UniProtKB/Swiss-Prot annotation:
This is 4-deoxy-L-threo-5-hexosulose-uronate ketol-isomerase. It comes from Salmonella paratyphi A (strain AKU_12601). Pathway: Glycan metabolism; pectin degradation; 2-dehydro-3-deoxy-D-gluconate from pectin: step 4/5. The keyword Isomerase applies. It is an enzyme of class 5 (isomerase). It catalyses: 5-dehydro-4-deoxy-D-glucuronate = 3-deoxy-D-glycero-2,5-hexodiulosonate. Belongs to the KduI family. Its cofactor is Zn(2+). Catalyzes the isomerization of 5-dehydro-4-deoxy-D-glucuronate to 3-deoxy-D-glycero-2,5-hexodiulosonate. GO terms for molecular function: 4-deoxy-L-threo-5-hexosulose-uronate ketol-isomerase activity; zinc ion binding. InterPro entries: KduI, KduI/IolB_isomerase, KduI_N, RmlC-like_jellyroll, RmlC_Cupin_sf. It comes from the Bacteria. GO terms for biological process: D-galacturonate catabolic process; D-glucuronate catabolic process; pectin catabolic process. SUPFAM superfamilies: RmlC-like cupins.
Length: 278
């Protein structure tokens, strides 16, 4: 388990490129036949990926020992979105078939967590966010057909994108975790611009659907002290509450956003005018 400490905004603005990447970038999300796990002190979110290839991958009691409990979800809830081939997640003996871009919310208290791919040649890629939970809401599958896509932006400003809200109060109940998937239209490059911060939530982005020769310049920092991190395909970045989180790519891309905090109202954000950015 890779543990990332919280960092003050005054400290963050003094960091060079390598230090920024070390603090906020998660480079290796998917490793064959393993799970990856990054634990952030910021709202205690856990971020990672699971890619079963030659055999199923189980998250067992070894993780619980690192968290001071018996199992990962003794005091946590889990959200998973599959960005790879078809697969399944077995939760306490019940199999949930999870296809490409299907998602599964897994309840606090679940013990057995096994992840499998249907085909080794096209393995599932289960990306997950895990957050502290105070009560148990039912495990539930969410497919793209269950969400109401919202298209925002304009081709003229290169920010036309479709937002798919998977884990939000209108779709299912969670303790604090929200997740969704935003896809840029072909030829569009900007996400979340004009940008914002949200004092009551932190956020993590996973960028994917990127070609090998492309990248995203992820914008972060306080609005008057902006910095950037160069992102490649299937990499994630941690965004503290005080930081903007926006990006511009060399080509169109898709990203998953996950939020943890005290407020699940999607529009609870502090907008930043473009002319106020520095």
């Amino acid at each position: 388990m890779d543990v990332r400490q919280s960092i003050h905004s005054e400290h963050a603005k003094t960091l060079d490129t390598q230090a920024l990447r070390r603090e906020f970038l998660i480079e290796n999300i998917f490793v064959a036949d393993e799970y990856t796990m990054v634990y952030s002190h910021i709202d205690r979110i856990i971020v990672g990926g699971i890619m079963p290839v030659s055999h199923p991958v189980e998250i067992g009691g070894e993780v619980g020992k690192q968290l001071g409990v018996s199992r990962l979800l003794d005091r946590r809830e889990l959200g998973v979105i599959n960005i790879g081939g078809a697969g399944a997640i077995i939760v306490d003996g019940q199999r949930h078939d999870i296809g490409h871009r299907d998602a599964l919310y897994i309840s606090k208290g679940a013990k057995e967590l096994v992840f499998v791919s249907n085909e080794a040649s096209r393995p599932a890629k289960f990306y997950y966010n895990c957050a502290p939970a105070h009560t148990a809401y039912p495990t539930k599958k969410v497919s793209p057909a269950d969400v109401a896509p919202v298209t925002l932006g304009d081709n003229l400003t290169s920010n036309r994108r479709t937002i798919n809200k998977y884990f939000v109060p209108d779709v299912l109940e969670t303790c604090q975790l929200s997740m969704g998937l935003t896809e840029l239209a072909p030829g569009n490059l900007w996400n979340t611009m004009p940008c914002h911060t949200h004092e009551r939530r932190m956020e993590v982005y996973l960028y994917f659907n990127m070609e090998e020769d492309s990248c995203v310049f992820h914008m972060m920092g306080q609005p008057q002290e902006t910095r950037h991190i160069v992102m490649r395909n299937e990499q994630a970045v941690i965004s503290p509450s005080w930081s903007i989180h926006s990006g511009v790519g060399t080509k169109a891309y898709t990203f998953i956003w996950g939020m943890v905090g005290e407020n699940q109202v999607f529009d609870d954000m502090d907008h930043v005018a473009v002319q106020d950015l520095r």
